[in-house]
Each structure stands twice: as C-alpha cells, then as structure tokens.
C-alpha cells in the first residue's frame, strides 16, 4: 500500500476517534480494503469502528482510548506481510485481522515474533490456530467443521447423483474443498470431479462443459464470491442444471450482483446470522441508519474488538501476552455473537455451521436465509 494512502486513512481514523495521545492503544485493522474482496474488508472495517466507538465511550481498555490504524492487504499474502511489518514498525500491539487464511497464516508469525496479538474475524483454515502460537485467535468457525456439514449434506441429498468439488487453489478455498471432500467420502460418497481453478479466472466455459459431459448434479465451490458468481451465471447460461453449494466465502450481496437471477437456490454454509438475534436489533438499526447493511463479518469483527477489550479489562493489563492469557482463561466474554470463550489454541466456542439458501427477501432483493 502506498504510504500517502496509508497516512491519509490513518489521519481519518484519528479524527474519527476524537484525537489521540501517547497513551492511546493502537489497534491495527488488517483486511482487503481494495480489490475483488473489498466488500469483506468494508464489513470488517465497519464492525471494528463501531465496536471501538462503543468501547471508547465506556472507557476503552483499562482507561486508555483505542486508536485505529488501517492496513490494506488486498487479500494478497505479500501485501499482507508488508502491512504486518508496517504495523510492527508503527508500534501496533493488537490487530483485528486478517480476513484471508493465506494472509493471516504468514502474518501471524511476524506478529508473534514482535509481541502483537491478532484476532482474525474470517480466517477459517485450521492451520491458523493448530500451530498454537501464543497470539492467534479467531472469532469465526473452522473449515474442518464447515466441511463436515457440507460434505454430509451432499452425501445425504445427492447420493444418487454426481458431485463436482471445485476450488480456487488458495489456502482457504482448497482447504475448505479438501475438508468437504473428506466429509463426503466419509459419508459414503465419492466425488466425480475434483478440480482447481485460478483465483481471478473469469471464463469457466470449458470446465462447465466438462461437468455437463460428466452428468454433474451438484457443484461444491471452495472459494470466494467473485468467481462463484461467474460460475453460477455461466452454469445457467450453458444449461448446467446442478445445485451450487459453497461456504462462508460467498456471504456477500455482491454474489447476487454478479450471478443475477441464477443465484436463486444457491446454498452455503455459515454460522447462524447475527442479524436474527433480537439482542442486536439496536446495533443493526444504527448501521442501517447510516446506509450500511451489516452483513456477515461485520459482526465477527465487532466481536473481535469486544473480546479484546473484555479480556484486557479482565486482565487489568494492556500487555498483549497478558491479554492473550486472559482471553484463554477469563472467558466467556459477552459479544454480538453471544458469549465466547477461547480454547488453548485460540478457537472460539460458537454454535455449529448451518445451511443457508439464497432467495429474494421481502424487499425483493436476493439474500441468504437459513434453511
């Protein structure tokens, strides 16, 4: 990210938080703020900002106000490493981020070596916490749990059909596809096709022709919404009438913008929608009053800040290592996702994944609704 852009965004953050002092706690927000996955970055940014505003109004972390600085990783591991090094150089000690597993895993090593605690709102690859670094936490669920749900669902509902498992060759996408494949196989069904495509590809006509020739009746996609939307639309255009199923990488209304009416009936796994929790009604209204729909990772980022602040206050310290210990030992912490405790690895206690289906809501717009 260009220095001028970074400084400009930081200045906006300082103004938004009402100024800063040398005693303020600097929290970095690492996310894809530009590029094809910027919709998720915006969710994270909005969630963090709202949670920090609430925390600061209540006294911050042990009486110290929180100041936000931003790092645009553009969903790219190399850019993410640059962001991490920039955060370290600026004296950031806590990070809400990153989003993509392929960014969070390499940056976590940099943060661990430099005393920075990170809470990832969207990193679902099991490897992120399986290494048991002292500083890695997440407020989202894991792909091994997500794959179990998706694989069993397909084995139960398409056992007489043929399944294609596709992925985008990223740590998140291929990792999720592999976990889903494992579950599908363990539930007595073998996939007909297993193929990877490149993130950023736009023409899937050859792959769709191959799936038509193979008689595919269900397609599982391990990847993000930009490619998913194109796949869904092109499948419809080429007459492939197969059920499309994916994971939490497609939970953005941009999916419907890309896929059009072909998005109707698409299914995906995700955690129960926090927008359905009446306890969040006031917060949801506040977002909507500002013209922002708080989708998906808005709440996971918000919960990350809540967990951080509550753990620091419980520890009576803003030292990252002491806060990390408190996160594992002082829970549960009250959040917009419900009460969360963290295990020794940094994984949260959350309800299981569920299935969602895309259809038109009362407003006439496509959205994902729990089945």
From Swiss-Prot:
Alphabetized InterPro entries for the sequence: Leu-bd (IPR028081), Leu_Ile_Val-bd (IPR000709), Peripla_BP_I (IPR028082)
Record keywords, A-Z: Amino-acid transport, Signal, Transport
Signal peptide extent: 1-23
One Pfam family of this chain: Peripla_BP_6
Superkingdom assignment: Bacteria
Protein role: Component of an amino-acid transport system.
Name by which UniProt lists this protein: Leu/Ile/Val-binding protein homolog 2
Source organism: Brucella melitensis biotype 1 (strain ATCC 23456 / CCUG 17765 / NCTC 10094 / 16M)
């Amino acid at each position: 990210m260009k220095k001028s852009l970074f400084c400009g965004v930081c200045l906006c953050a300082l103004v938004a938080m009402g100024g800063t002092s040398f005693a303020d706690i600097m929290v970095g927000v690492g996310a894809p703020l530009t590029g094809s996955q910027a919709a998720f970055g915006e969710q994270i940014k909005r969630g963090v900002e709202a949670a920090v505003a609430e925390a600061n109004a209540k006294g911050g972390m042990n009486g110290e106000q929180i100041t936000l600085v931003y790092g645009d990783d553009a969903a790219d591991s190399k850019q993410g490493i640059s962001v991490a090094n920039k955060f370290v150089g600026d004296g950031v000690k806590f990070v809400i981020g990153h989003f993509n597993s392929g960014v969070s895993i390499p940056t976590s090593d940099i943060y661990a070596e430099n005393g920075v605690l990170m809470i990832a709102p969207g990193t679902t690859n099991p490897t992120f916490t399986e290494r048991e670094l002292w500083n890695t936490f997440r407020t989202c669920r894991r792909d091994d749990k997500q794959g179990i749900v998706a694989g069993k669902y397909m084995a139960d509902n398409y056992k007489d059909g043929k399944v294609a498992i596709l992925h985008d060759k990223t740590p998140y996408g291929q990792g999720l596809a592999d976990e889903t494949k494992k579950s599908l196989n363990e539930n007595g069904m073998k996939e007909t096709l297993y193929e990877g495509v490149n993130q950023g590809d736009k023409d899937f006509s050859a792959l769709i022709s191959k799936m038509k020739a193979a008689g595919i009746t269900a397609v599982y996609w391990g990847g993000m919404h930009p490619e998913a939307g194109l796949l869904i639309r092109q499948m419809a255009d080429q007459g492939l009438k197969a059920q499309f199923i994916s994971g939490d990488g497609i939970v953005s209304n941009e999916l419907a913008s890309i896929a059009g009416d072909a998005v109707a009936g698409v299914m995906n796994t995700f955690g129960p929608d926090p927008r359905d929790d009446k306890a969040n009604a006031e917060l949801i209204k506040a977002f909507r009053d500002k013209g922002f729909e708080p989708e998906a990772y808005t709440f996971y980022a918000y919960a990350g800040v809540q967990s951080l602040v509550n753990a620091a206050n419980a520890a009576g310290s803003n030292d990252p290592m002491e806060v990390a210990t408190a996160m594992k030992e002082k829970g549960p912490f009250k959040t917009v996702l419900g009460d969360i405790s963290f295990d020794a690895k940094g994984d949260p206690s959350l309800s299981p994944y569920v299935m969602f289906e895309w259809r038109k809501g009362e407003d006439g717009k496509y959205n994902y609704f729990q089945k």
